[in-house]
Protein backbone atom coordinates (compact mmCIF):
# COMPACT_ATOMS: atom_id res chain seq x y z
CA UNK A 1 0.00 0.00 0.00
CA UNK A 2 1.45 3.42 -0.93
CA UNK A 3 1.99 5.98 1.80
CA UNK A 4 -0.66 8.63 2.15
CA UNK A 5 -1.68 11.52 4.35
CA UNK A 6 -5.16 10.92 5.68
CA UNK A 7 -7.14 14.14 5.29
CA UNK A 8 -10.40 14.64 7.17
CA UNK A 9 -11.81 16.77 4.36
CA UNK A 10 -15.39 15.50 4.45
CA UNK A 11 -16.05 15.56 8.17
CA UNK A 12 -14.03 18.37 9.67
CA UNK A 13 -14.55 18.39 13.42
CA UNK A 14 -13.55 21.98 14.21
CA UNK A 15 -16.50 24.37 13.75
CA UNK A 16 -15.88 27.60 11.85
CA UNK A 17 -17.33 29.58 14.77
CA UNK A 18 -14.43 28.42 16.92
CA UNK A 19 -11.91 29.38 14.25
CA UNK A 20 -13.38 32.86 13.78
CA UNK A 21 -13.79 33.46 17.50
CA UNK A 22 -10.23 32.45 18.33
CA UNK A 23 -8.90 34.57 15.46
CA UNK A 24 -10.60 37.68 16.84
CA UNK A 25 -9.58 36.88 20.42
CA UNK A 26 -5.94 36.74 19.36
CA UNK A 27 -6.18 39.97 17.35
CA UNK A 28 -7.85 41.69 20.30
CA UNK A 29 -5.23 40.58 22.83
CA UNK A 30 -2.39 41.55 20.47
CA UNK A 31 -3.72 45.10 20.62
CA UNK A 32 -4.14 44.98 24.42
CA UNK A 33 -7.88 45.59 24.11
CA UNK A 34 -9.88 44.07 26.93
CA UNK A 35 -12.97 41.98 26.35
CA UNK A 36 -15.01 44.60 28.21
CA UNK A 37 -13.74 47.44 26.04
CA UNK A 38 -14.50 45.62 22.80
CA UNK A 39 -17.93 44.62 24.05
CA UNK A 40 -18.62 48.25 24.92
CA UNK A 41 -17.54 49.41 21.47
CA UNK A 42 -19.85 46.83 19.91
CA UNK A 43 -22.66 47.66 22.36
CA UNK A 44 -22.76 43.99 23.17
CA UNK A 45 -23.03 41.93 26.34
CA UNK A 46 -19.55 40.91 27.55
CA UNK A 47 -20.67 37.33 28.16
CA UNK A 48 -22.06 37.04 24.63
CA UNK A 49 -18.78 38.32 23.16
CA UNK A 50 -16.84 35.86 25.31
CA UNK A 51 -19.00 33.03 23.97
CA UNK A 52 -18.28 34.21 20.42
CA UNK A 53 -14.54 34.23 21.03
CA UNK A 54 -14.73 30.72 22.43
CA UNK A 55 -16.73 29.36 19.51
CA UNK A 56 -19.91 28.79 21.49
CA UNK A 57 -22.17 30.98 19.35
CA UNK A 58 -22.75 31.83 15.71
CA UNK A 59 -21.61 35.25 14.54
CA UNK A 60 -24.65 37.42 13.72
CA UNK A 61 -24.76 38.89 10.23
CA UNK A 62 -22.53 41.93 9.90
CA UNK A 63 -20.70 41.42 13.19
CA UNK A 64 -17.40 40.44 11.57
CA UNK A 65 -17.38 43.74 9.69
CA UNK A 66 -18.08 45.62 12.92
CA UNK A 67 -15.23 43.92 14.75
CA UNK A 68 -12.93 44.42 11.75
CA UNK A 69 -13.59 48.16 11.83
CA UNK A 70 -12.62 48.35 15.50
CA UNK A 71 -9.58 46.04 15.42
CA UNK A 72 -8.47 47.20 11.97
CA UNK A 73 -8.60 43.62 10.72
CA UNK A 74 -10.05 42.21 7.53
CA UNK A 75 -11.39 38.73 8.22
CA UNK A 76 -12.24 36.82 5.04
CA UNK A 77 -15.20 34.47 5.52
CA UNK A 78 -14.50 32.53 2.31
CA UNK A 79 -14.38 28.91 3.53
CA UNK A 80 -12.47 27.88 0.40
CA UNK A 81 -9.39 29.60 1.82
CA UNK A 82 -9.47 27.16 4.73
CA UNK A 83 -9.66 24.17 2.41
CA UNK A 84 -6.88 25.66 0.28
CA UNK A 85 -4.63 26.13 3.30
CA UNK A 86 -5.12 22.49 4.29
CA UNK A 87 -4.28 21.45 0.74
CA UNK A 88 -1.04 23.44 0.84
CA UNK A 89 -0.11 21.92 4.20
CA UNK A 90 -0.55 18.33 3.09
CA UNK A 91 1.23 18.91 -0.22
CA UNK A 92 4.18 20.56 1.52
CA UNK A 93 4.59 17.70 3.98
CA UNK A 94 4.30 15.08 1.25
CA UNK A 95 6.95 16.82 -0.83
CA UNK A 96 9.10 17.10 2.29
CA UNK A 97 8.85 13.35 2.87
CA UNK A 98 9.88 12.59 -0.70
CA UNK A 99 12.59 15.29 -0.62
CA UNK A 100 11.11 17.32 -3.47
CA UNK A 101 12.55 20.67 -2.44
CA UNK A 102 11.73 22.51 -5.65
CA UNK A 103 8.08 21.48 -5.42
CA UNK A 104 7.97 22.93 -1.91
CA UNK A 105 9.47 26.21 -3.08
CA UNK A 106 6.95 26.34 -5.93
CA UNK A 107 4.08 25.96 -3.44
CA UNK A 108 5.40 28.78 -1.27
CA UNK A 109 5.73 30.98 -4.33
CA UNK A 110 2.04 30.42 -5.05
CA UNK A 111 1.14 31.01 -1.40
CA UNK A 112 2.78 34.44 -1.41
CA UNK A 113 0.15 35.68 -3.86
CA UNK A 114 -2.73 35.05 -1.44
CA UNK A 115 -1.01 34.87 1.95
CA UNK A 116 -2.70 37.95 3.40
CA UNK A 117 -6.16 36.63 2.58
CA UNK A 118 -5.39 33.16 3.93
CA UNK A 119 -3.90 34.29 7.24
CA UNK A 120 -6.94 36.51 7.88
CA UNK A 121 -9.53 33.79 7.50
CA UNK A 122 -10.74 30.52 9.00
CA UNK A 123 -7.36 29.15 7.87
CA UNK A 124 -5.42 31.25 10.40
CA UNK A 125 -4.32 28.34 12.61
CA UNK A 126 -3.77 25.84 9.82
CA UNK A 127 -1.64 28.38 7.98
CA UNK A 128 0.50 28.85 11.07
CA UNK A 129 1.73 25.27 10.52
CA UNK A 130 2.54 26.17 6.92
CA UNK A 131 4.55 29.11 8.25
CA UNK A 132 6.22 26.90 10.86
CA UNK A 133 7.53 24.62 8.12
CA UNK A 134 8.85 27.65 6.25
CA UNK A 135 10.79 28.83 9.30
CA UNK A 136 11.99 25.28 9.98
CA UNK A 137 13.25 24.29 6.55
CA UNK A 138 13.61 27.42 4.42
CA UNK A 139 14.26 30.58 6.43
CA UNK A 140 15.46 28.75 9.57
CA UNK A 141 14.16 31.15 12.20
CA UNK A 142 14.05 29.48 15.63
CA UNK A 143 12.38 32.38 17.42
CA UNK A 144 9.48 32.34 14.94
CA UNK A 145 9.08 28.58 15.42
CA UNK A 146 8.91 28.95 19.20
CA UNK A 147 6.42 31.80 18.81
CA UNK A 148 4.15 29.67 16.60
CA UNK A 149 4.52 26.71 18.97
CA UNK A 150 3.32 28.81 21.90
CA UNK A 151 0.35 30.11 19.90
CA UNK A 152 -0.78 26.74 18.57
CA UNK A 153 -0.26 24.85 21.83
CA UNK A 154 -2.71 27.27 23.40
CA UNK A 155 -5.21 26.77 20.57
CA UNK A 156 -4.99 23.07 19.70
CA UNK A 157 -8.78 22.87 19.62
CA UNK A 158 -8.60 25.02 16.48
CA UNK A 159 -6.70 22.32 14.57
CA UNK A 160 -8.00 19.14 12.98
CA UNK A 161 -6.38 15.88 14.12
CA UNK A 162 -4.55 15.42 10.81
CA UNK A 163 -3.16 18.95 11.11
CA UNK A 164 -1.99 18.30 14.68
CA UNK A 165 -0.15 15.15 13.58
CA UNK A 166 1.87 17.17 11.06
CA UNK A 167 2.39 20.01 13.54
CA UNK A 168 3.77 17.66 16.21
CA UNK A 169 6.00 15.89 13.67
CA UNK A 170 7.54 19.20 12.57
CA UNK A 171 8.18 20.22 16.17
CA UNK A 172 9.80 16.85 16.78
CA UNK A 173 12.17 17.53 13.89
CA UNK A 174 12.88 20.99 15.29
CA UNK A 175 13.77 19.76 18.78
CA UNK A 176 15.74 16.78 17.46
CA UNK A 177 18.39 19.17 16.19
CA UNK A 178 19.85 19.43 19.69
CA UNK A 179 20.67 16.32 21.75
CA UNK A 180 19.75 18.25 24.89
CA UNK A 181 16.14 18.57 23.68
CA UNK A 182 15.81 15.01 22.36
CA UNK A 183 13.32 14.20 25.12
CA UNK A 184 11.04 16.96 23.81
CA UNK A 185 11.42 15.67 20.25
CA UNK A 186 10.56 12.15 21.40
CA UNK A 187 7.40 13.36 23.09
CA UNK A 188 6.25 15.24 19.99
CA UNK A 189 6.93 12.31 17.64
CA UNK A 190 5.02 9.90 19.86
CA UNK A 191 2.09 12.30 20.20
CA UNK A 192 2.09 12.80 16.43
CA UNK A 193 1.88 9.04 15.87
CA UNK A 194 -1.16 8.89 18.13
CA UNK A 195 -2.93 11.39 15.86
CA UNK A 196 -2.28 9.73 12.49
CA UNK A 197 -2.80 6.49 10.59
CA UNK A 198 0.03 3.95 10.66
CA UNK A 199 0.04 3.86 6.84
CA UNK A 200 0.45 7.62 6.52
CA UNK A 201 3.47 9.61 5.44
CA UNK A 202 3.44 11.41 8.78
CA UNK A 203 3.72 8.13 10.69
CA UNK A 204 6.54 6.94 8.43
CA UNK A 205 8.38 10.24 8.88
CA UNK A 206 8.07 9.93 12.65
CA UNK A 207 9.39 6.36 12.71
CA UNK A 208 12.37 7.41 10.61
CA UNK A 209 13.09 10.33 12.95
CA UNK A 210 12.60 8.21 16.08
CA UNK A 211 15.35 5.82 14.99
CA UNK A 212 17.91 8.62 15.25
CA UNK A 213 16.38 9.95 18.48
CA UNK A 214 16.72 6.57 20.20
CA UNK A 215 20.25 6.16 18.80
CA UNK A 216 21.54 9.33 20.46
Positions of predicted regions on the chain:
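Short alpha-helical DNA-recognition segment
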Residues: 31-51
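Amphipathic alpha-helical segments of tetratricopeptide repeats
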Residues: 108-116, 149-157, 190-198
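Tandem amphipathic alpha-helical repeat scaffolds
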Residues: 87-99, 126-140, 165-180, 205-216
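Alpha-solenoid helical repeat architecture
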Residues: 79-80, 119-125, 159-167, 198-209
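DNA major-groove recognition helix of helix-turn-helix/homeodomain DNA-binding modules
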Residues: 60-77
